[in-house]
Amino acid sequence: MTPAPPFLQATALACERDWRVLFENLDLHLCAGDMLQVSGPNGSGKTSLLRLLCGLMQPTAGQVLLNGQVLGRQRAPGCDLLWLGHAPALKDLLTPLENLAWLCALHQPAGADAIGHALNAVGLAGFEDVPCHTLSAGQQRRVALARLHLPGPSLWILDEPFTALDQQGIAQLENHLADHCEQGGMVVITTHHTLSRLPAGYRSIDLAKGSA
């Protein structure tokens, strides 16, 4: 049987910022069940690589394929990719329920009950209707991460998702990411945190070395 092609594939990828080459000739791919951790020192291009894989930036050279299609600057509505950046990216005046309802509408709408269950999963039961600007940094991070507990894309691209989490939140997120991969999902992640649970499809790439 011919193996399925990678869901996400980057070929001969290069990135340049402020006239400086961050990386070049970079190849990577993800199939169902894979987790790819991107590492490297500050300034090596970790966030830039993730933004390239999301179509939020264009590479200096090379291309990114998502489900066999070249990923351009404008992703198609509802494409099978979920991006969570370093900042929670919440609307301060909206509640967690309202923020998540708006975010889910980009992929697969979710009702109040489903959103309530997602907030409960990240330890925010009872905070559904509190304006997000009143929440702590850790609570805002958990609101954003609640998106991972709602129906949606199978590919998650996450930039430093453990930021501002306590030890319980870190352990819960580690398990959720591993479970997602073991159920056929995919994760690309940057983190300074040492992961204690790795799925079978775990790999890492060090941008300082340019190797996977």
UniProtKB/Swiss-Prot annotation:
Localisation: Cell inner membrane
Positions of the ABC transporter domain: 8-212
Keyword Cell membrane on entry: yes
Reaction(s) catalysed by this chain's protein: heme b(in) + ATP + H2O = heme b(out) + ADP + phosphate + H(+)
GO biological-process terms attached to the record: cytochrome complex assembly
InterPro entries, per the entry: AAA+_ATPase (IPR003593), ABC_transporter-like_ATP-bd (IPR003439), ABC_transptr_haem_export_CcmA (IPR005895), P-loop_NTPase (IPR027417)
Topological type in the membrane: Peripheral membrane protein
One term of GO molecular function: ATP binding
Residues noted as binding ATP in the record, renumbered to the chain: G40, P41, N42, G43, S44, G45, K46, T47
Domain of life (superkingdom): Bacteria
EC nos: 7.6.2.5
GO cellular component: plasma membrane
Main localization (coarse): membrane
PROSITE patterns: ABC_TRANSPORTER_2, CCMA
Subunit-structure text: The complex is composed of two ATP-binding proteins (CcmA) and two transmembrane proteins (CcmB).
PANTHER family assigned to the protein according to its UniProt record, in alphabetical order: ABC TRANSPORTER I FAMILY MEMBER 1
Function: Part of the ABC transporter complex CcmAB involved in the biogenesis of c-type cytochromes; once thought to export heme, this seems not to be the case, but its exact role is uncertain. Responsible for energy coupling to the transport system.
Name the record gives this protein: Cytochrome c biogenesis ATP-binding export protein CcmA
Organism: Pseudomonas syringae pv. tomato (strain ATCC BAA-871 / DC3000)
Taxonomic path: Bacteria, Pseudomonadati, Pseudomonadota, Gammaproteobacteria, Pseudomonadales
